[in-house]
Design a protein with these regions (language model features):
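Aromatic (Trp/Tyr) and acidic
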Residues: 1-138, 142-145, 159
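Short strand-coil-strand connectors
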Residues: 107, 151, 203-204
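A short, sequence-level motif marking secondary-structure junctions
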Residues: 117, 159-163, 213-217
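Short, hydrophobic/aromatic-enriched beta-strand segments in well-ordered soluble domains
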Residues: 137, 174-185
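Solvent-exposed beta-strand/loop surfaces of large extracellular or lumenal domains
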Residues: 143-167, 187-193
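Glycine/proline-rich low-complexity spacer/linker segments in large multi-domain proteins
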Residues: 181-228
Length: 229
């Protein structure tokens, strides 16, 4: 299952130090878990679909590869378990400082993280203790688009592996560290065991379109394709 794959990538990243696996954790959550959740919009977009209230916010086996969202207690429990495990490990305070492993909203006594995605990805970190901050840089983010500011001033931090290191000498409690980078567009195709081939449009690590699309309750918007001239 997707949840099991996420947990496997998370544990391998934590216990082997392979930071690139956090990219897999984030991609599976953004490209599969979030789109696969049953929401009120599913009922509005397809009025013929019965939408019991207990089904809202749930997960379960889907009827089609990328549509027909399901909802059952075991599927919902597994995804809740997975997301809880990920949340607990978004950041950690280690000997080197505050380590931001993943780019999701988070808050505890040591740090606050907020994220947004518009024309580009923005991750804002506000340390609540005075320490170094290490920010993981996604491997898929074009290096030339990565920018980091501290309290509005752009810096060029030292990078160690996949992490940008912001020294505590540049920080104070409550400083605002902002990481920005592009969300590159690309397209991929996937052929299912039954022979059906899907075309996906990506923006960063999120799927923003699929062709052909399935109904009801699709995971993604329909990707508009052009016939050859």
């Amino acid at each position: 299952s997707t949840g099991a794959a996420i947990r496997l990538a998370l544990w391998l990243a934590l216990h082997t130090g392979r930071a690139e696996l956090y990219d897999d954790v984030e991609r599976l959550i953004r490209a599969r878990i979030i789109p696969g959740q049953t929401t009120e919009a599913d009922g509005r977009d397809d009025p013929g679909t019965a939408m019991p209230r207990l089904q809202l916010g749930a997960w379960g086996a889907n009827q089609y590869p990328h549509a027909g969202k399901g909802a059952n207690p075991s599927g919902t429990a597994e995804i809740a378990h997975t997301l809880s495990a990920v949340y607990q490990h978004i950041t950690a305070r280690e000997a080197a400082g505050l380590v931001v492993r993943m780019h999701f909203d988070y808050a505890d006594d040591s740090i606050e993280i907020t994220t947004s995605r518009n024309e580009e990805a923005t991750t804002t970190v506000r340390p609540r203790v005075h320490d170094n901050v290490l920010l993981r840089l996604p491997a898929w983010a074009p290096a030339e688009t990565v920018r980091i500011t501290v309290d509005g001033r752009q810096i060029s931090p030292l990078t160690v592996g996949r992490f940008a290191c912001v020294p505590k000498e540049l920080l104070r409690v409550g400083s605002e560290i902002v990481l920005r980078h592009a969300l590159p567009a690309r397209q991929t195709t996937e052929t299912m065991p039954a022979g059906d081939t899907y075309q996906f449009a990506w923006r960063g690590d999120e799927i923003v379109g699929v062709h052909p699309n399935d109904w009801p309750m699709p995971f993604y918007p329909t990707l508009e394709t052009r016939e050859p001239d």
